């Protein structure tokens, strides 16, 4: 077994370590929780640990002949945790790129431990499906945003489920802020096809909180932890930031435009690419492109008449792009 490296500890005695291609959280108190995992998924009591595991190509091949639950039980043994009292999430993101964010207010503390990969598997709720599951047979895609949330207070099952909704909405906010494109449609991603969330509360705490929605301070802290940790984890894993997204080419990526199409008939391709990238970074060009793309979105969502949007887009180009005509 690899040497454990401590990356996080909190006021309740929880400790998170990186080892064996995983982040393992060892709980310092008795915890109940809710998880999307196939190992002890749903609501459970008496969790002792939780883990997030990097799924290598070799292990993806292993899954072709085994269930995800069987794999997680096998991995529990490798990590030295009891499969009866743990839950595990899978991802293709590197554990070294994880981000931990903690927020506090008075006696309330919330932490999120997050990994995020969005290059391959980012998708929008309602996109065409990638597979149809029957009798447990389906395809496993790589990508994945996984979040483990820890609170120092006690939450009942309904409150944990409420927190799951808040955390999911916060994930969508993080992706929206970065304008992450879906890989399966022209829309913006709301997550990936294989995201996982696990939320744990302190069963030993006397004060039981009843709400984790957006109006509650608990919900606010959960959401802020999720938004910040996902944003930073994406930066570490795939180098997507607000700065990198401030580009015409980045904004057009959701339309599957191939940069090679821009210069296939150009003789001096190197110079053309240099000029194209410089032009793509200009704030004015990003603003023009974004304005027109927003009009397209309005039309596709039946919120704006196509002819009106077309005329306005044409006017934007005519009034702002005369230097290029």
Language-model-detected regions and their locations in the chain:
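Alpha/propeptide regions of enzymes that mature by internal proteolysis
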Residues: 1-325
């Amino acid at each position: 077994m690899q040497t454990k490296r401590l990356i996080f500890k909190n006021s309740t005695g929880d400790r998170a370590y990186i080892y064996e291609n995983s982040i393992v959280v060892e709980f310092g108190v008795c915890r109940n929780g809710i998880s999307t995992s196939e190992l002890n998924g749903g609501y459970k009591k008496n969790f002792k640990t939780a883990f997030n595991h990097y799924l290598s190509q070799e292990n993806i091949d292993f899954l072709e002949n085994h269930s995800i639950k069987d794999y997680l039980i096998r991995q529990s043994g490798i990590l030295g945790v009891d499969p009866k009292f743990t839950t595990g999430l899978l991802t293709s993101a590197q554990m070294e790129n994880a981000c931990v964010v903690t927020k506090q207010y008075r006696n309330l503390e919330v932490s999120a431990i997050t990994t995020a990969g969005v290059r391959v598997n980012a998708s929008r709720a309602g996109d065409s499906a990638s597979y149809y599951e029957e009798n447990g047979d389906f395809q496993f895609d790589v990508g994945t945003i996984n979040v483990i949330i820890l609170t120092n207070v006690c939450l009942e099952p309904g409150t944990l489920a409420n927190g799951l909704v808040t955390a999911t909405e916060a994930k969508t906010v993080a992706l929206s802020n970065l304008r992450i494109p879906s890989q399966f449609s022209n829309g913006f991603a709301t997550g990936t096809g294989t995201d996982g969330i696990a939320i744990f509360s302190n069963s030993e705490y006397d004060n039981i909180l009843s709400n984790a929605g957006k109006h509650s301070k608990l919900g606010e802290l959960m959401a802020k932890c999720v938004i910040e940790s996902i944003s930073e984890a994406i930066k570490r894993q795939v180098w997507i930031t607000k700065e990198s997204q401030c580009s015409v080419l980045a904004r057009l990526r959701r339309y599957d435009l191939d940069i090679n199409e821009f210069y296939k008939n150009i003789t001096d391709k190197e110079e053309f690419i240099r000029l194209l990238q410089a032009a793509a970074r200009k704030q004015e060009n990003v603003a023009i492109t974004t304005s027109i793309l927003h009009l397209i979105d309005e039309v596709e969502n039946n919120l704006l008449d196509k002819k009106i949007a077309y005329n306005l887009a044409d006017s934007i180009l005519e009034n702002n792009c005369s230097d290029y005509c």
